[in-house]
Curated annotation (Swiss-Prot):
Residue positions assigned to the propeptide: 24-52
Gene Ontology BP annotations: adult feeding behavior; cellular response to starvation; defense response to bacterium; defense response to fungus; G protein-coupled receptor signaling pathway; killing of cells of another organism; negative regulation of appetite; positive regulation of MAPK cascade
Protein name as it appears in the record: Niq CART3
Signal sequence range: 1-23
Additional observations: Two short synthetic peptides Tn CRT2 (AA 78-90) and Tn CRT3 (RKGSQMGKKCECP) have antimicrobial activities against both Gram-positive and -negative bacteria, as well against the yeast C.albicans.
Record-linked Pfam families: CART
Superkingdom of origin organism: Eukaryota
Length: 103
């Protein structure tokens, strides 16, 4: 009989301790919510910007149009022996193959 009472008391004390830590955990989650939501919103914003840039590049590829760039702006990319055109230089300027800029 005493063993049952001791066992019940031990079980109740363990359950009370577990309930307290869960409540504290919930309180910490509520306090950390603004920080976590701001971080998630920042990551989502970066993803949306990246998707918009990719969509713009897809439109340029589809219609075969290359955007125009200003003088002094990089106009080409070199990867090994190959060169790729990033943008079209304005009239009167040309893309320098050494500097990869509109001059």
């Amino acid at each position: 009989m005493w063993a049952r009472a001791v066992l019940c008391a031990a079980l109740l004390s363990v359950m009370c301790l577990a309930g307290c830590t869960e409540a504290e955990r919930d309180e910490r989650d509520v306090q950390d919510y603004p920080y976590k939501s701001n971080r998630m919103l920042g990551a989502l914003h970066e993803d949306v910007e990246q998707l918009e840039m990719n969509r713009m590049n897809a439109l340029e590829k589809r219609y075969g149009q290359i955007r125009s760039c200003d003088v002094g702006e990089p106009c080409a990319i070199r990867k090994g022996s190959r060169m790729g055109k990033k943008c079209e230089c304005p009239q009167g300027a040309s893309c320098n193959r050494l500097l990869l800029k509109c001059l």
